[in-house]
């Protein structure tokens, strides 16, 4: 397959709109082009993604890569798109199964060695993802924040290789369990007791 579509989320205030990362691998001079109104941190992800893919034991395609971040009119910022871009490249180049990312959304920054680094805005992203009835794959340090939502499937990984093994079903990640939230708090002091 020379085309892949991976789902992720952006951040727009408290909202987390859906972003489609479309990757097309074609013959031609080796290059990587990102279109769809990416800001500087997203454009810089080219080098992080290339190194992370190579250092995780995969091949970086020596072909022409075009990556579209849709919708094009929504600004994309931050490094949270590294993981979905890397997975799109691996699926489009045939290194991961074609439909392995169905019903999943991905978020996370990649280090040069393939480690996943935490990102901000996870609760907003998790709420939007749950609303669309998708599962979420994110960096391990972000798992506790995302698993506060009831009836929501969250998977956490610490390395790109772990994510790929899960998607290839060679070593599946355990679903992060929801943390029960105690809503019965008793406070000795009450603002109603304040006088003056």
Where are these regions (language model features)?
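Peripheral, non-AAA+ core regions of ATP-driven protein-machinery
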Residues: 1-196
């Amino acid at each position: 397959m020379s085309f892949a579509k991976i789902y992720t989320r952006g951040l727009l205030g408290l909202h987390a709109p859906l972003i489609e990362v479309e990757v097309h691998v074609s013959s031609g001079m080796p290059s990587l082009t990102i279109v769809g109104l990416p800001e500087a941190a997203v454009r810089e992800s080219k080098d992080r993604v290339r190194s992370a893919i190579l250092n995780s034991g995969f091949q970086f395609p020596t072909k022409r890569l075009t990556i579209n971040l849709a919708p094009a009119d929504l600004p994309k910022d931050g490094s949270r798109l590294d993981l979905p871009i890397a997975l799109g490249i691996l699926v489009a180049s045939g290194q991961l199964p074609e439909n392995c990312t169905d019903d999943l959304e991905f978020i996370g920054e990649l280090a040069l060695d393939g480690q996943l680094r935490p990102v901000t805005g996870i609760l907003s992203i998790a709420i939007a993802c749950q609303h669309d009835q998708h599962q979420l794959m994110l960096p391990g340090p972000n798992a506790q924040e995302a698993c506060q939502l009831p009836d929501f499937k969250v998977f956490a990984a610490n390395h790109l290789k772990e994510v790929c093994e899960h998607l290839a079903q060679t070593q599946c990640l355990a679903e992060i369990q929801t943390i029960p939230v105690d809503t019965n708090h008793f406070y000795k002091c009450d603002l109603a007791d304040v006088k003056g």
